[in-house]
Amino acid sequence: MKKNELKPAVVFEQFAKINEIPRPSKREEKMIEYLKNWGESRGLGTKVDETGNVIIRKPATKGYEHLKTVILQSHMDMVCDKLVDVEFDFDRDPIKTYIDGEWLTAEGTTLGADDGIGCAI
Protein backbone atom coordinates (compact mmCIF):
# COMPACT_ATOMS: atom_id res chain seq x y z
CA MET A 1 0.00 0.00 0.00
CA LYS A 2 1.10 3.56 -0.72
CA LYS A 3 0.21 6.71 1.23
CA ASN A 4 -1.85 8.03 -1.68
CA GLU A 5 -3.97 4.85 -1.52
CA LEU A 6 -5.13 5.38 2.08
CA LYS A 7 -8.90 5.73 2.47
CA PRO A 8 -10.78 7.93 2.95
CA ALA A 9 -8.37 9.90 0.78
CA VAL A 10 -9.61 13.35 1.80
CA VAL A 11 -8.94 12.57 5.48
CA PHE A 12 -5.41 11.30 4.87
CA GLU A 13 -4.63 14.23 2.56
CA GLN A 14 -5.68 16.58 5.36
CA PHE A 15 -3.69 14.55 7.90
CA ALA A 16 -0.58 14.93 5.72
CA LYS A 17 -1.06 18.72 5.76
CA ILE A 18 -1.53 18.68 9.53
CA ASN A 19 1.71 16.72 9.97
CA GLU A 20 3.53 19.63 8.32
CA ILE A 21 2.48 21.85 11.24
CA PRO A 22 4.45 21.75 14.50
CA ARG A 23 1.97 21.36 17.37
CA PRO A 24 3.58 20.42 20.68
CA SER A 25 1.47 20.76 23.83
CA LYS A 26 1.11 24.36 25.02
CA ARG A 27 2.46 25.60 21.66
CA GLU A 28 -0.44 25.00 19.29
CA GLU A 29 -0.51 28.52 17.79
CA LYS A 30 0.35 27.35 14.25
CA MET A 31 -2.33 24.67 14.35
CA ILE A 32 -4.90 27.13 15.69
CA GLU A 33 -4.10 29.50 12.82
CA TYR A 34 -4.28 26.66 10.26
CA LEU A 35 -7.71 25.50 11.45
CA LYS A 36 -9.02 29.07 11.69
CA ASN A 37 -7.92 29.78 8.10
CA TRP A 38 -9.32 26.44 6.91
CA GLY A 39 -12.78 27.23 8.28
CA GLU A 40 -12.82 30.85 7.15
CA SER A 41 -11.61 29.98 3.64
CA ARG A 42 -14.65 27.74 3.25
CA GLY A 43 -17.09 30.38 4.48
CA LEU A 44 -17.84 28.46 7.67
CA GLY A 45 -18.61 30.14 10.97
CA THR A 46 -15.20 30.08 12.64
CA LYS A 47 -13.99 31.50 15.92
CA VAL A 48 -11.16 31.02 18.38
CA ASP A 49 -12.08 31.38 22.04
CA GLU A 50 -9.95 32.80 24.85
CA THR A 51 -8.28 29.44 25.59
CA GLY A 52 -7.44 28.68 21.96
CA ASN A 53 -10.28 26.33 21.10
CA VAL A 54 -11.18 26.59 17.42
CA ILE A 55 -14.91 26.30 16.81
CA ILE A 56 -16.03 25.74 13.23
CA ARG A 57 -19.75 25.53 12.45
CA LYS A 58 -21.11 24.00 9.27
CA PRO A 59 -24.82 24.26 8.49
CA ALA A 60 -26.76 21.06 7.89
CA THR A 61 -26.91 19.69 4.37
CA LYS A 62 -30.20 20.57 2.67
CA GLY A 63 -32.86 18.10 3.72
CA TYR A 64 -31.10 17.21 6.98
CA GLU A 65 -31.84 20.41 8.91
CA HIS A 66 -34.37 18.61 11.14
CA LEU A 67 -31.85 16.09 12.48
CA LYS A 68 -29.86 16.48 15.68
CA THR A 69 -26.62 18.43 15.62
CA VAL A 70 -23.40 16.43 15.28
CA ILE A 71 -20.33 17.66 17.15
CA LEU A 72 -16.82 16.48 16.31
CA GLN A 73 -14.08 17.29 18.83
CA SER A 74 -10.37 16.58 18.95
CA HIS A 75 -7.31 18.08 20.52
CA MET A 76 -4.71 19.87 18.39
CA ASP A 77 -1.46 19.07 20.17
CA MET A 78 0.56 15.89 19.91
CA VAL A 79 2.77 13.73 22.05
CA CYS A 80 6.32 14.79 21.22
CA ASP A 81 8.55 11.76 21.54
CA LYS A 82 11.38 10.51 19.37
CA LEU A 83 14.00 7.81 19.24
CA VAL A 84 17.16 8.66 21.20
CA ASP A 85 19.39 8.67 18.11
CA VAL A 86 17.06 10.87 16.02
CA GLU A 87 17.59 14.62 15.73
CA PHE A 88 14.22 16.31 15.56
CA ASP A 89 12.83 19.69 16.63
CA PHE A 90 9.12 19.39 17.41
CA ASP A 91 8.80 23.19 17.29
CA ARG A 92 10.07 23.35 13.71
CA ASP A 93 10.22 20.02 11.86
CA PRO A 94 7.33 18.32 10.03
CA ILE A 95 6.41 14.74 10.90
CA LYS A 96 7.67 12.42 8.15
CA THR A 97 5.35 9.49 7.54
CA TYR A 98 5.66 6.24 5.62
CA ILE A 99 3.81 2.97 5.14
CA ASP A 100 5.18 -0.06 6.99
CA GLY A 101 3.17 -3.07 5.83
CA GLU A 102 -0.42 -2.12 6.62
CA TRP A 103 0.50 0.69 9.03
CA LEU A 104 1.05 4.41 8.56
CA THR A 105 3.94 5.34 10.85
CA ALA A 106 6.53 8.08 11.34
CA GLU A 107 10.30 8.19 10.84
CA GLY A 108 11.83 8.19 14.31
CA THR A 109 9.07 10.17 16.03
CA THR A 110 5.55 9.73 17.26
CA LEU A 111 3.03 9.87 14.43
CA GLY A 112 0.79 12.60 15.77
CA ALA A 113 -2.32 10.62 14.89
CA ASP A 114 -3.54 11.21 18.43
CA ASP A 115 -5.40 13.41 17.58
CA GLY A 116 -4.18 14.84 14.29
CA ILE A 117 -6.41 12.37 12.50
CA GLY A 118 -9.34 13.74 14.52
CA CYS A 119 -8.57 17.24 13.26
CA ALA A 120 -8.30 15.86 9.72
CA ILE A 121 -11.80 14.43 9.89
Spell out what each predicted region is.
Residues K2-K26:
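N-terminal capping segment at the start of a domain
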Residues A9, E29-K30, A113, A120:
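Residue-level recognition of alpha-helix initiation/capping sites
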Residues F12, A16, K36, C119-A120:
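Predominant activation on well-ordered alpha-helical scaffold segments within soluble catalytic domains
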Residues A16-N19, G39, G43, C80:
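Structural signal for hydrophobic packing residues in well-ordered secondary-structure cores
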Residues I21-R23, K58, S74, G108:
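Short glycine-centered, acidic/aromatic-flanked micro-motifs in structured strand/loop junctions
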Residues P24-K68:
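A non-catalytic alpha/beta surface segment that caps or lines the substrate-entry region
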Residues Y64-I121:
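Active-site metal-coordination/substrate-binding segment of hydrolases
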